[in-house]
Amino acid sequence: MQGNERIQDKNEKEKAYAPYLDGASVSTDNGPILSVFALQEIMQKIRQNQSDMAAHAPDVDGAIPEVMTIISGIKGLLEEKDYKVINAPPNSFRTIPMQSMEYVLQVNTFYERMSEIGGPVDETDPIGFYALILEKLKFLKSEGAFILQGIATKDYRGAEIADPEIIGVSFQNALSHLAAIDRQIIQDTLNGMIIENGLVADRNVDVFRAAMSDPIYRIRNVLQGYIEGIQYGELRESVNWLMRLGLRKRIEFANDFLTDFRRADTIWIISQRLPINANVIWNVPRCHIANLNTNVALCLPTGEYLMPNPRINSITITQRITQTNPFSIISGLTPTAVQMNDVRKIYLALMFPNQIILDIKPDSSHAVDPVLRMVAGVLGHVMFTYGPIMTNITPTMAELLDAALSDYLLYMYNNRIPINYGPTGQPLDFRIGARNQYDCNAFRADPQTGRGYNGWGVVDVQRVQPSPYDHVQRVIRYCDIDSREIIDPRTYGMNMTYPIFREMLRMLVAAGKDQEAAYLRQMLPFHMIRFARINQIINEDLLSAFSLPDQNFDVVLHNLIQGNFGETDPVILEVSWASIWFAFVRRFEPIARSDLLEAAPLIEARYAAELSTMQMDVQQLRMMRARVPDTVINATPSQCWKAVLKNAPEPIKNLMNLSHSFSFVNVRDIVRWSQQRDIQESLAYVLNREAWAIANDFEDLMLVDHVYIQRTMLPEPRLDDINEFRRQGFFHTNMIDGAPPIGDVTHYTYAIANLQANMGQFRAAIRRTLDDNGWIQFGGMLRNIKIKFFDSRPPDEILTAMPYVYTEEERDGVRMVAFKYATTATAYFLLYNVEYSNTPDTLITVNPTFTMTKIHMRKKIVRRVRAPDVLSQVNKRLVAYKGKMRLMDVTKCLKTGVQLARPTI
């Protein structure tokens, strides 16, 4: 027993140092492993190229991100909902009682809460200002994105009426201050708020009226319209597209999740819509490497590297005791871990033509094994494609393979096999053979026709039937193999061939390489299974929104030959000569499909939807920069991009920066991306679009540019009649109903303020204007507004606050001044409370109190209303779903492998 344990431990140690050797199964790779490997190789290549450049490029020496963690993060975003289900709308108005029995103050609580979002605006920090705008937009969407279900109601004389808790007005605290007749009027108004029955599609709902702030109501209406529209067809369209995708990917639909959408008590909600607009994903600046690695991690199946029957070698290249030909010499070699990494690169290049291409790895010691090089020259012509539409290798590697094949045909020169050289002296420019001489120019690389490689004489890129993804209509057919064929490894490949393989056998026979020709002929079924599996993987598993678009795919080879730089230049990975042999005698056999394959459409949709939302944010921030240049005087287009990225979900940001591409994104990329018209419709996008439409009026975000200075005295009324004073409900505010006359306003720009400050006359000029009862406006700045209520005299820092900051200091004997217009303005409301014991001059002071700042807003945030009109704001029509209705968010159910009951509406 101890001996067996020692042998087992020894075997485990050997496997630890040789992880690729396990009998016929050499290695097992899956999508995440290969994606990390590909990303490491790509980043290593990028860093090496940058170190070789004469000009210093941005340093990207960062850690390699974990692709699966990023994808899992995006999948986790699907759990987040862009709405909430509540049983009562939020209170949009609150009532402040006064000493008057006839009047009360009503405050729009939405604007009150909005004023608390964010800090002061700084004109020298554009990113901070943009972040403030995005934060306010997020608050606006969270306030209005709600669905009502199971609202509280009452029975009154056989009618169903609304409970006071759901009408959106908080007034109970003011009832004790009102007269009995006014309370009765309010009660009668409440008794008349009848709940009506309505229909959404064919679903029964409750319809009632409530008070709601206009911005919240607009967001709420958009959400309600989105849900109502889904009931009529969007779900059916999504399911039909998933069925098309399942047929293309050969995914069987399971019956694990069946939902009967025809039930009249079900309302379904879809946050993400299908199909995906893949152009949104590919419009992202510098995205092709990130999309490539995401495609690998998301869709590539788990597979193992299998070797052919070893008897093929025994009856062909190793049948003699004395082994002198190149194939027989290397047939017993065992690959190292580095060489197996090169095999991985080769299969990645075969699975991603025109995206990953290969080049020969330069040997620093100049000690290339001539045997391996010649064998690789032969096998490379039947392993790789070089034209006319796609390629797996660079032009340099094609020339090296031609030279290696030429050396292989000529290394045993003798009189028995004559050779007639051509006039050019280039590799393969000769005719070889005794009787029927073969023109070896047929194997010299020509990317225009694909001559010499697998693409010659076959149509390896076709557009046969419509694809579920509009941007990828191509079907890859390596070796003219249809990927829809059933592959049985026991019989597949028998009596199959393709043009370049036939020509290779003819050339080897003409050159007297009978053993090698016999070996390749016996390897042909194994070789055809290899490319049949690759075709299946490319056309089925790897088909996704992250696949390279046809318009980019078709021009890669042309740009590569002409030396043109495109948007999606291929990634070049270097391999050794030996790895071509090891890749030829191994094939990638899928053993399990990716675990993320069924959820891939939803992950793609969520990613595209977030990108569309970010793109809209950049567009709107750039427009806002043009509207209020004084607010962001030093802003650049790249700062819009940075602010949006800062606000984006972390998984989305990490996926966009998967290859550290943010270090290379320039202003041109940002502007072009923000001007793209492709969008991915989703609930989040629709809500964000409406939120930006609301934000066009800055006052809805509690940002105001009409802030003035005028010196006025704080009202100090005489208390001649305390009852009358109480009845009027006297209050004071620094918010004015209308803007002052233009002729009375002195507008101070930065230039004017700096000029007067440098002349030492700034404070004197301000004082002179205020003494003349004039108005002063400092710039066109947007200032954040705070709302405060006082029942006694406000503090001096609020009354005497100025909408600017003026600093003066002396540096090295030089007087320095600085201005800052971006300050927070306070809108205060002073409620006067008096007692019967007060004398007429109780509110009067000997020295008057002055207030300086005046704010003009078109929005009426605080209103004084008559007591019977407390419910006058209850004028918005709302739809609420009944408590027994089922609100089902079926977004997570839109998976490729889940068959849903199709709606019949």
From Swiss-Prot:
<dbReference type="GO" id="GO:0005198">
    <property type="term" value="F:structural molecule activity"/>
</dbReference>
<dbReference type="Pfam" id="PF01700">
    <property type="entry name" value="Orbi_VP3"/>
</dbReference>
<comment type="function">
    <text>The VP3 protein is one of the five proteins (with VP1, VP4, VP6 and VP7) which form the inner capsid of the virus.</text>
</comment>
<dbReference type="InterPro" id="IPR016029">
    <property type="entry name" value="Inner_layer_core_VP3_Reovir"/>
</dbReference>
<dbReference type="InterPro" id="IPR002614">
    <property type="entry name" value="Inner_layer_core_VP3_Orbivir"/>
</dbReference>
<keyword id="KW-0946">Virion</keyword>
<dbReference type="GO" id="GO:0044423">
    <property type="term" value="C:virion component"/>
</dbReference>
<protein>
    <recommendedName>
        <fullName>Core protein VP3</fullName>
    </recommendedName>
</protein>
<comment type="similarity">
    <text>Belongs to the orbivirus VP3 family.</text>
</comment>
